[in-house]
Amino acid sequence: MNARFSRLRGGLRVGADFFLRRAILAPSNVDCPRGLVDRIEDLDARTFDVSRIHPDIVVFFEDTGALDLLIRSHWVFPFSIAWRVVRVVLRWVGQFVLPIREGRIATRVFGIDREQDGRADARGVVRTYEETSEVMQVAAYATHQDAQGRRYMSATFPMPGGNITGILRLDRIEGTQGEDQEGRLAIALTSVSKRHPNEQAERDAAGVWFVIGRWSIRAPLHEQIEMWASAMPSRPASLDPKIFEGTTIVAKHEQRLFGVRFVTHHYWFRPRR
């Protein structure tokens, strides 16, 4: 199986118990995955040498559940007003309950039935607020390989009647901001598609999609997550690792609708305590 999209879809409610309630969890005798991918090489889009990624950042991909997360969200007016209304609905649905300002997040990774999902390396991820155990996000992650051999992250979020799937390409951050003194790289995960040099093909597979049954529609949404090891001097000053004691990774996550940025999330990751 090398499906781009998952078969999973939500009912009226998703919630933190989605995989259990839908009997999608893998049997207990199956090894549980630890991260969004098994190896960082599984996301090699053939645009740079992934072996140069800073090892602290690799932990986010390969051992995701071992990290605690602090999020600070900065909503852009008037989306900041609209979000307070939309968030009430999404709390009831139990999906995409992003912070208004700040949240401490716990992440759990599960083995799931890959036949039901339809993707060969799918795994479930549930993120909840540490203080309340309320769900923030429910997702099934896998990888996708296109006809040119480029690999992408395929992140599926069940929603009522279908799902939203982000096909994300792993890039390096260019310039001096993206490399430390030892040549180790910061990275970006992006849904912005592009044409690759020396190829006549149309733009690559990156994007965000609404998926309903066999139908998929490209959404007017884009996101980009830039990640640095906290020790990298090139990280943005706004991502001071002292904000969350023990931080090893910092990140900036921008989300856009029709090209207009509506929110920026700042992330601090540290080993679970």
Model-derived features: positions:
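Soluble ligand-binding/transfer domains with enclosed cavities or grooves
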Residues: 3-270
